[in-house]
Structure formats: C-alpha cells, structure tokens
C-alpha cells in the first residue's frame, strides 16, 4: 500500500521544532549538546525521512525501549524504516548535529521524492568524476539519466571537491542525482571547493596537492573497478583550473591503477584495476557524439536524456543563474573522446559501452 505522510508533533528541550518538516533547508535546528527529540503522531509511523547538513550517527528509540542504530552510511538525506512501527519515537542526536527536516509516513510505499539511497556501488559499470556539484549535468549531459535512470547500470558518481562550506549545495547535489535516476550514494572527497583554484591549472596546483588528488583518483578506480570512466575536458570546459586538474590527474591515475606499487595503500584495500576505457568531455581524438536530445527515456515518461539533464541541473538552485545545460556551443555536453582504451577504438560511436562485453565486467 502507499504510505501516507503523517502530521508530527516534535519536542526537544529548548528547541523550536515548529518548522522541522518545512521543505526549506534554511530552517535548521542546531544542537549544541547531545539531544533527544521526541516525535509523536496520531497513527503508527512506519518510515522516517531526515535531512541533515552533515553526516551524523544517531539512534532511534521507540516507546518500548527498542533501539535502532542510524546514520551508519553517512547519508545526509536518510530514509529509515522502523523495525517496529510506533506512534511515538525518539531521536537521540549528538552535539553539533544540524537537522533540517523530518518527515514521517505510515507503513507502506513512500512517495518517489523520498530519497532511499543505496550505499556506493560494490562494482560500477560507469564511474563519473565531476569536480563540483552540477558539473555532472552541465558537462556530461544525459549520461546519468540514460545509463543510470533508463538502462539501470551501476553508476557511481565521485566528486573531486566538496561543498560543506556552502551547506545548501550538498542538498542540491543529492536532489539532482536523485532526479536523474542515480540511486547509489555519491562519493564526496575531502578536498574543499576553493575559489582560488579557478583561474588556471597552475592556480589549482597551488591550492590542491596534485599527488593527493592523483592518489584519490587511483583509489576510486580501484574501489569501484569501473568498465567505463567519464571525466572532464582537459582544458577545463570554460577554463576552470580544478576541472583541468581533475582530468590531468585522472589520465595519470589510469596508468597507475593497475600497478600495486603505485599508491600501495589503496591497492592493499581494494586490489588493483586496469580500466577498460575512459572518455573525456571534448577530447579531440576518437570522438563520439551522444545525441542526448534524441533519446526519449521510458523511465522518465518519454522525456529525453537532455531534458532530464536540464531537470537535474535545475535542482542546483544556487547555480542556475550562471549556467545552463547545452547541446551545441563550445562546451557541447554531447561531445566526448575516447582518451584511454584497453579494448580498442570505437566503431559505432554511439555508446560509451561499445566493446565492453558483460564477460569483461560490463553491465549484465
């Protein structure tokens, strides 16, 4: 049965929780100490959906004293199914938690807008490596709606920088991925988004340690063992130094990920991996043009992959005045080149997975 959203009464010592299920992430509750928040409803709650500003481990307690450990996966948009439905539940949250929203539902199938994230892929068919939140839609176009949403491939997104300093952006990031059909939670690196990295490759090298970024790239390749990797334009699209550094370190990492002597820590943890093929946006050799605007997707009621890329980008409310998803122009989101291959050149040039048989670790 379909779950119904239930009205909640929320209480916690000294807290104003009146707006806690207002879908405006700017109404936040900041906890200065370990805090218990009690939620009461007139009917049994079967599921909760919570939005935090940062990952947090917490406990859920029902009236009979049953406890559930939550937040183990580090998701800031967290769906919780109660082991035993109850009309009163208590959230035990640690100091420094920033809680934005809480929604409760009767037992059953929750609405589609509730993000039920899966952990990152065990093995990815496709690994996509944007630098900042929104790059995945702007420069890679219909890639995510087509391969994740429509084809159901295991698609892992890993961001080279984080936006914890601008707390609204991680929410935009997750909302955009969810909108285009990605269901495996993204990897978000420990490298902060730094404005000083923008001007040139050299400026990016001054604020990021290139060796550390390369190690991070190698780790992603070994961890997710992708059949296909997708990265930025080596010239940084509109010339962004951090995009350039991302592409340059990725090209280096592709040569190292199969060698256990390079960055041995991640080799020990994940084993080594030789990537079959990697495309870069706008790479001038072995070019391929993905006609996202001519790909209607049944998973999205016939909207095209290009339309869905624009819909994903529209979730990045703080960025929409600066950019738009475009097929055409100098940063055409349809144009890619095969920058690295262990499976030969493309012939048909209409699918990133050309020459990737399922026996070679491609999609089943």
What are these regions (language model features)?
Residues 12-58, 64-263:
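Active-site beta-strand->loop->alpha-helix modules in alpha/beta enzyme cores, enriched
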């Amino acid at each position: 049965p379909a779950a119904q959203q239930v009205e909640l009464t929320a209480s916690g010592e000294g807290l104003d929780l009146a707006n806690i299920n207002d879908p405006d992430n700017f109404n936040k509750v900041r906890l200065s100490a370990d805090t218990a928040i009690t939620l009461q409803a007139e009917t049994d709650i079967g599921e909760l959906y919570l939005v935090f500003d940062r990952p947090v481990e917490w406990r859920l307690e029902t009236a009979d004293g049953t406890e559930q450990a939550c937040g183990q996966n580090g998701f800031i948009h967290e769906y919780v199914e109660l082991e035993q439905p109850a009309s009163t539940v208590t959230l035990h949250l640690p100091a420094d938690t920033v809680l934005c929203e809480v929604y409760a539902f009767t037992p059953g199938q929750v609405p589609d807008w509730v993000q039920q994230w899966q952990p990152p892929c065990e093995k990815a068919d496709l690994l996509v490596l944007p630098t900042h939140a929104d790059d995945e839609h702007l420069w890679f176009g219909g890639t995510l709606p087509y391969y994740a949403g429509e084809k159901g491939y295991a698609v892992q997104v890993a961001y080279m920088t984080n936006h914890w300093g601008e707390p609204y952006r991680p929410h935009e990031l997750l909302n955009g991925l969810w909108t285009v059909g990605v269901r495996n939670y993204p990897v978000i690196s420990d490298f902060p988004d730094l404005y000083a990295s923008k001007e040139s490759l050299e400026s990016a090298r001054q604020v990021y340690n290139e060796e550390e970024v390369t190690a991070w790239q190698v780790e992603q390749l070994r961890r997710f063992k992708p059949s296909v990797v997708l990265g930025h334009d080596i010239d940084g699209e509109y010339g962004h130094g951090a995009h350039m550094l991302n592409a340059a370190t990725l090209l280096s990492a592709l040569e190292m990920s199969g060698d256990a002597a390079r960055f041995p820590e991640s080799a020990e943890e994940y084993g080594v991996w030789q990537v079959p093929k990697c495309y870069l946006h706008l790479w001038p050799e072995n070019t391929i043009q993905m006609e996202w605007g001519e790909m209607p997707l049944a998973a999205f009621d016939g909207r095209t992959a290009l339309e869905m890329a624009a819909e994903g980008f529209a979730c990045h409310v703080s960025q929409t005045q600066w950019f738009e998803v475009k097929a055409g122009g100098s940063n055409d989101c349809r144009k890619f080149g095969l920058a690295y291959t262990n499976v030969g050149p493309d012939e048909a040039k209409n699918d990133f997975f050309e020459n990737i048989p399922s026996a070679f670790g491609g999609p089943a």
